[in-house]
């Protein structure tokens, strides 16, 4: 059985990708990050996901991205912005962008993949996020994969490492629809940038608004609780 390394945040995208990798019959090794994020609730949500999909091993890696901040998710001096509906969302990179986050996460995933002998890494990025988050575009994934195969022992030995981004051309609406078809229980996910201490989502941050809109377009109620 082929092994995969899945980046798992506890949000809707990574949960859907986990289901896709499971459907493809990979032996799954999941990797999550405790990087000083406000939305630490996501790390509690992944527990149910790893049980459902029989994850072989789950690594939670501690990284202190608060050391340099620069994002509303890692710096208490920067407020998480709230919006009034889907049409009010910004078309520029917002303050919730975490500098180089996907590059950092993928680098750890590559290291883990080399150790366990996996040539397949899965990440839940998609182009519909790329206007706000530049490390979610196809060109980024392609360039990172090329770099990895130039700069790793596996790569130079001809054991090509592939960065799988199965959601890359999907909208959030399509991602939720795909996950529902695969039986993803979105009750065990959280997207909010600033949830309460008892894991209630705010409903007004960029992530919550996009999530709620996607469920609405699928004519289904979001199963998580909001303030």
Swiss-Prot record:
Cofactor note: Binds 1 zinc ion per subunit.
Gene transcribed to yield this protein: queC
Native source species: Rickettsia prowazekii (strain Madrid E)
Cofactor: Zn(2+)
Keyword Transmembrane tagged: no
UniProt-listed GO biological process terms: queuosine biosynthetic process
Family of the protein in this entry: Belongs to the QueC family.
Pathway given in the UniProt record: Purine metabolism; 7-cyano-7-deazaguanine biosynthesis
EC number: 6.3.4.20
Reaction(s) catalysed (UniProt annotation): 7-carboxy-7-deazaguanine + NH4(+) + ATP = 7-cyano-7-deazaguanine + ADP + phosphate + H2O + H(+)
Binding-site residues for Zn(2+), renumbered to this chain: 192, 202, 205, 208
Protein name: 7-cyano-7-deazaguanine synthase
HAMAP family to which the protein is assigned, alphabetical: QueC
Keywords: ATP-binding, Ligase, Metal-binding, Nucleotide-binding, Queuosine biosynthesis, Zinc
């Amino acid at each position: 059985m082929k092994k995969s390394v899945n980046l798992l945040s506890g949000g809707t995208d990574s949960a859907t990708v986990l289901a896709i990798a499971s459907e493809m019959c990979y032996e799954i090794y999941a990797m999550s990050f405790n990087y000083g994020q406000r939305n630490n609730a996501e790390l509690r949500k992944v527990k149910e996901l790893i049980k459902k999909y029989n994850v072989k091993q789950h690594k939670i890696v501690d990284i202190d991205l608060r050391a340099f901040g620069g994002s509303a998710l890692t710096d208490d001096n920067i407020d998480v912005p709230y919006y009034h509906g889907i049409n009010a969302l910004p078309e520029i990179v917002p303050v919730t962008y975490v500098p180089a986050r996907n590059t950092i996460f993928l680098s750890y995933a590559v290291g883990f993949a080399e150790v366990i002998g996996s040539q397949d890494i899965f990440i839940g990025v998609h182009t519909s996020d790329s206007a706000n988050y530049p490390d979610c575009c196809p060109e980024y994934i392609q360039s990172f994969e090329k770099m990895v195969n130039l700069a790793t022992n596996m790569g130079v030995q001809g054991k090509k490492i592939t960065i799988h981004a199965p959601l890359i051309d999907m909208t959030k609406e399509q991602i939720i629809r795909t996950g529902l078809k695969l039986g993803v229980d979105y009750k065990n996910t959280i997207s909010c940038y600033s949830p309460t201490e008892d894991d209630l989502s705010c409903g007004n941050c960029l992530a919550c608004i996009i999530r709620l809109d996607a469920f609405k377009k699928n004519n289904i109620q979001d199963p998580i609780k909001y303030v």
